[in-house]
A protein has these predicted regions:
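Peripheral (often C-terminal) accessory segments that flank ATP-dependent C-N-forming ligase machineries
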Residues: 5, 302-395
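A conserved helix-loop-beta module that forms one wall/lid of the active-site cleft
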Residues: 97-167
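ATP-dependent carboxylate/phosphate-activation module, predominantly the ATP-grasp catalytic core
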Residues: 185-189, 193-259, 282-308, 317
Length: 395
């Protein structure tokens, strides 16, 4: 039996799909959720303990640590699938040969290289590579009619993105590179693309959700997705949803050919009155993974592997709407059991989650969009209320 390693921030959803396939499965992850399947070959960095804090993800996560504890697994397995938090470029050239997926993503993960490669062919926000905040301010002052955001040269999930304005104070860390990008206000959308050597095809469009969608603040942290993309799930009054879907399908496939994307990948967009802007490519299995599985009723990991091995994959039509919503803790709280049938990525009982850290994920499906939306939003209210019941004093 061939051996498969899943490696990344959280492997729970992929593990469940992998265990249905004919592989000996290995897993290395940062998070240890209580609903993560326990397997023989498994390593987890974050040890959640009763009455102890799980800390702050941004302060504690380091991709190098996951790679370090995975060395023996990497040597032993036949295949590797990097998930979020790990780049193919983090591996040695020898180990990259084992990766099922894109093996070199430098022109994608480097947002300025990505911009330069596609700016003449695709609609993109104007982007600059900056040395410091002073340079960013100088550029913005020369174009006073344009709003800008500052974001890391590399990174995903919407972290460390700041709107540049007169009231903001932005501190750039020494040694870290940033870009200044034209701020495009609009509707966040996403495509999931499957690629092999012989084909590239868009399998699903979705409404991408950030904290800004719900709180109307300047936080762009990823919260979830709703799919498939329809006039209901886009959550905005839109005239021609079919035209938008077709443009996303075509643009995503063209981008997949431009970068020769292999396996499952995501393309993020912003739509406004000026058109559809390409924001970035996520060159790996993305956050829509479970939603697509629920909507299409397929094993998405199997589809990813088959496309990487150049096998044909039949993609059925969507059977359900699916909605994923990550709940970030409303306060510092001690986790207690919540009686809901649609919550995942659960903390261990008695462990402490810091305020604004990911608490759990709500994922559900229904053929009726309104029923699905109401159920997920109701579950979100229950989770937030339960978290507040077990609020802990700040350190």
């Amino acid at each position: 039996m061939e051996k498969l390693l899943l490696i990344g921030i959280n492997t729970r959803s992929m593990l469940k799909s992998a265990l249905k396939l004919d592989y000996e499965v290995f897993s290395t992850s940062y998070f240890s959720t209580s609903d993560t399947p326990a397997i023989k070959n498994q390593k987890i960095i974050l040890e959640e303990k009763d009455n102890e804090s799980s800390g702050v993800f941004e302060d504690n996560f380091d991709s190098a640590s996951i790679l370090d504890i995975s060395r023996d697994y990497i040597d032993e397995v036949d295949y590797i699938i990097p998930i979020s938090g790990i780049s193919p470029n983090d591996f040695t050239k020898k180990d990259r040969k084992k990766i099922l997926g894109n093996k070199n993503t430098s022109n994608i993960e480097n947002k300025f290289k990505f911009y330069k490669k596609i700016k003449d062919e695709f609609k993109v926000p104007e982007t600059f590579l900056i040395k410091d905040v002073d340079e960013a301010i100088e550029i913005s002052e020369n174009k006073s009619d344009v709003k800008y955001i500052v974001k890391p040269l590399k990174g995903s999930g919407g972290y460390n993105i700041n709107l540049l304005n007169d009231d903001s104070y932005i501190q750039l860390n020494d040694g870290e590179k940033f870009i200044l990008q034209e701020y495009v206000e609009g509707i966040n959308l996403s495509s999931s693309v499957l690629g092999s050597d012989n084909y590239k095809k868009t399998i699903m469009n979705s409404r991408l959700l950030t904290e800004h969608d719900f709180k109307k603040n300047n936080s762009y942290i990823y919260i979830g997705n709703i799919l498939p993309l329809t006039k209901e799930s886009i959550l905005t009054e839109i005239k021609d949803i079919d035209k938008i879907n077709n443009e996303m399908i075509e643009t995503s496939q063209n981008l997949a050919y431009t970068f020769d994307l292999i396996g499952s990948n995501g393309v993020d967009y912003i739509l406004n009155e000026n058109g559809l802007y390409v924001i970035e490519i996520n060159p790996r299995i993305q956050g829509t993974f479970e939603c697509i599985e629920k909507s299409l009723q397929i094993n998405m990991l199997d589809a990813h592997i088959k496309s990487c091995l150049n096998e044909n994959v039949d993609i059925p039509k969507a059977k359900y709407y699916a909605y994923k919503k990550i709940i970030y803790s409303p306060c510092r709280n001690k986790y207690s059991k919540i009686d809901l049938d649609n919550i995942y990525d659960l903390p261990h009982l008695g462990t402490i989650t810091e305020k604004s850290e990911p608490l759990l994920t709500i994922i559900d499906k229904n053929s009726n969009f309104d029923k699905l939306y109401k159920k997920v939003e109701n579950s979100a209210k229950i989770v937030n209320n339960e978290a507040k019941k077990y609020q802990q004093d700040a350190i």
